[in-house]
Amino acid sequence: MARFFLTHPVESFDKWLPLFDDDKANRTAAGLSDVGVYRKVGDENSLLIVLEGNPDSMKKMLASPELAETMKEAGVLAPPEVFSGEKL
């Protein structure tokens, strides 16, 4: 099991959050679970999303055209930077 730390800017946190919440079923179906969502101190539109699951599932989800469309609709301004890690 790995943890994935994704960062990206959004147009508006208030616009993004409901779409992220609505997409939980897709993350769950992909074998990923939510760990947490964080906003950068001093910049509420710069986000860190932490997920947990299988690295192959994460890669597949990130390549999904459905996710790309959801991110566009949610106002994501750039592709996420992803750090994948395993707890030591």
Residue ranges of model-derived segments:
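Absolute protein N-terminus
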Residues: 1-2, 88
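Short, well-ordered beta-strand segments in beta-rich or mixed alpha/beta enzyme
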Residues: 2-9, 36-64
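Short, flexible beta-strand-to-coil junctions
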Residues: 9-11, 88
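Short amphipathic alpha-helical segments
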Residues: 12-34, 66-71
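Glycine-rich beta-strand-turn "strand-cap" elements at beta-sheet edges
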Residues: 30-47, 70-88
